[in-house]
Amino acid sequence: MRPPRGGGSFRGRGGRDNGGRGRGRGRGRGRFGGGNYDEGPPSEVVEVATFLHACEGDAVFKLSNVKIPHFNAPIYLQNKTQIGRVDEIFGPINESLFSIKMREGIVATSYSQGDKFFISPEKLLPLSRFLPQPKGQSGGRGEGRVPPRGRGPPRGRGNFRGRGAPRGASRGFQPRGGPRGGFRGRGRA
């Protein structure tokens, strides 16, 4: 087994490898190149947009759903035949447009204005995700809440003294106004 990237050893918290918490395992294996993997047709599709026009090989659509499609989400005909993937989303938020990168062998000019296109409901996001949240409403991380704590031990556990804190734990908290200063090092047992 190789040591974690950037960590240099198996001891401690893993250095720059995000704490050695398993994120680095299996990198590159089992993934499909660039998200272009054909997932097959979904069990259900809903109308998402109508065709406006072709532009430089891509197709431009007007959103007809109240939700916004994911970037790179597959777009289908009503019979669940995939024609391409969402490339760009643009325009005013209440009249959004998006372009589709067509699949190989499918020509954007073969469709006419008003043709309907479909998407898996799992690939849609609510419009509220793209709107500013009013102050005080629970939104993103840390807004209006107690700030998240780091990796250290729970409060009230005191101070770890001596050499070599337990694996994955910090050196503890110093009381307010207590000694501040240099780095003591990790220590080797």
From Swiss-Prot:
UniProt GO MF annotations: RNA binding
Biased composition (Low complexity): 162-177
InterPro entries reported in the protein's UniProt record: Gar1/Naf1_Cbf5-bd_sf, H/ACA_rnp_Gar1/Naf1, Transl_B-barrel_sf
UniProt lineage: Eukaryota, Viridiplantae, Streptophyta, Embryophyta, Tracheophyta
Compositional bias ranges of the Gly residues kind: 1-12
Pfam family, one: Gar1
Subcellular location: Nucleus, Nucleolus
UniProt keyword terms in alphabetical order: Nucleus, Repeat, Ribonucleoprotein, Ribosome biogenesis, RNA-binding, rRNA processing
Subunit structure of this chain's protein: Component of the small nucleolar ribonucleoprotein particle containing H/ACA-type snoRNAs (H/ACA snoRNPs).
Official protein name in the record: H/ACA ribonucleoprotein complex subunit 1-like protein 2
Record family assignment: Belongs to the GAR1 family.
